[in-house]
Amino acid sequence: MLDKIIRIATRQSPLALWQAHYVQHLLQANHPGLQIELVPMVTRGDIILDTPLAKVGGKGLFVKELELALLDGRADIAVHSMKDVPIAFPEGLGLVTICEREDPRDAFVSSHYAHLDDLPAGSVVGTSSLRRQCQLRERRPDLIIRDLRGNVGTRLAKLDNGDYQAIILAVAGLKRLGLENRIRYAMSAEESLPAVGQGAVGIECRLDDDHTRQLLAPLNHRHTELRVCAERAMNIRLEGGCQVPIGSYAELEGDTLWLRALVGAPDGSQMIRGERRGPAAEAEQMGIELADELLSRGAREILAAVYLDNPAR
């Protein structure tokens, strides 16, 4: 079992490399002596930094090159932030493991202000996420929301240079990079509902690679898997992709799953929210039913307008 070297395809950003090393550590802790090699790659999402993601294909741009490496045999597994994983996979590939979730909340980051509510009218807030943008605009229509691309370090540098009065990042990413001190506060799910899968690390591989799948099996975290399953089922039913104004967050309370979701107009003028509670074993069905409810209440029209503006998703 341990003779073969496991090659991990990963992006080259500091956060992506952290995630790859994290999976390497988990694998070697479960399989002492296992040899692992990282295969760092540059994706289109890392190269195209001057255009909002929604305009150039969404977050799937961050995974396509990694998937090609799996398909042509250059790598055995690919490690992803779950919030970047598209709703569909190339034939022969699939998501086989979801590791234990880190804090899924959004972080308010600012050099001079402790809270979103403290920002003066006209302040510039940076985020490229349509999900974050619509919730910010609903809560604070007096703010100026501007796109913000690049890795975490680049985004923080732009904040420190005074380009923005505040930026919104993922708590999980900042914690993983040892940058917790930059978090002014973690935004509640009521204030900023997280993205589908936010805070979780997923592992993709060839579905016919039984050897690798056996090695990965102990890394799967069942509670996280159930939560993310519900969130992704909702997103798939909405045909949501990764770069659309959709939020979804599931929590486990014993054997009961509590799923919340929203679809919002990017300008914050319309927000459709819903929730479901039910047996955790029915996570996928709950996600589908909640999506159907949102669609029936106007989400279909909101998403159609978004896709018209951003045909590459």
From Swiss-Prot:
Family: Belongs to the HMBS family.
Name listed for the protein in its UniProt record: Porphobilinogen deaminase
Catalytic activity: 4 porphobilinogen + H2O = hydroxymethylbilane + 4 NH4(+)
Domain of life: Bacteria
The species this protein was found in: Yersinia pestis
Enzyme Commission code: 2.5.1.61
Function: Tetrapolymerization of the monopyrrole PBG into the hydroxymethylbilane pre-uroporphyrinogen in several discrete steps.
GO BP: heme biosynthetic process; protoporphyrinogen IX biosynthetic process
Matches recorded under InterPro entries: HemC, Porphobilin_deaminase_cofac_BS, Porphobilin_deaminase_N, Porphobilinogen_deaminase_C, Porphobilinogen_deaminase_C_sf
S-(dipyrrolylmethanemethyl)cysteine modifications at: C242
Required cofactor(s): dipyrromethane
Keywords: Porphyrin biosynthesis, Transferase
Further comment: The porphobilinogen subunits are added to the dipyrromethane group.
SUBUNIT field: Monomer.
GO cellular component annotations of the record: cytoplasm
GO terms, molecular function: hydroxymethylbilane synthase activity
Cofactor info, note text: Binds 1 dipyrromethane group covalently.
Pathway: Porphyrin-containing compound metabolism; protoporphyrin-IX biosynthesis; coproporphyrinogen-III from 5-aminolevulinate: step 2/4
